[in-house]
Amino acid sequence: MSNLAVKYKQQAQEEVQIQTPPQQMVQPKAKAKITRIEKLLYVAFIGFLLYACVAFIGNKAGLYQVNVEAATIEQKIVQQQKENQELQAEVEKLSRYERIAEVAKKHGLEINANNVKGLK
């Protein structure tokens, strides 16, 4: 019988070993911690990007405003040139010899060829 008791003990030990498989030591992976300096650098970089975006948009808005003003000034220049041409045509029309002679006769003046000087 002692043999049976030994067999029973061996079976119990085998069952215990079967039930509990050998545990592997799982090493937890260490998280890569972000240091304060890295956080500061990330925040500074994001801040710089935001500043660059705002500055870029501001410059574009300023450039648009300057272009609008330039177009307005060009329009005024064209209008002034057209007005100058019309006034120059009127000056040429009013300074014709026939018109001056007619106004002179109307006021009782006579043309004396010796006193006439050409101007240009």
Swiss-Prot record:
Positions on the Cytoplasmic side per record topology: 1-36
Originating organism: Bacillus anthracis
Protein name from the UniProt record: Cell division protein FtsL
UniProt family annotation: Belongs to the FtsL family.
Function: Essential cell division protein.
Any single GO BP term: FtsZ-dependent cytokinesis
Coiled-coil residue spans: none
Keyword set, alphabetical order: Cell cycle, Cell division, Cell membrane, Membrane, Transmembrane, Transmembrane helix
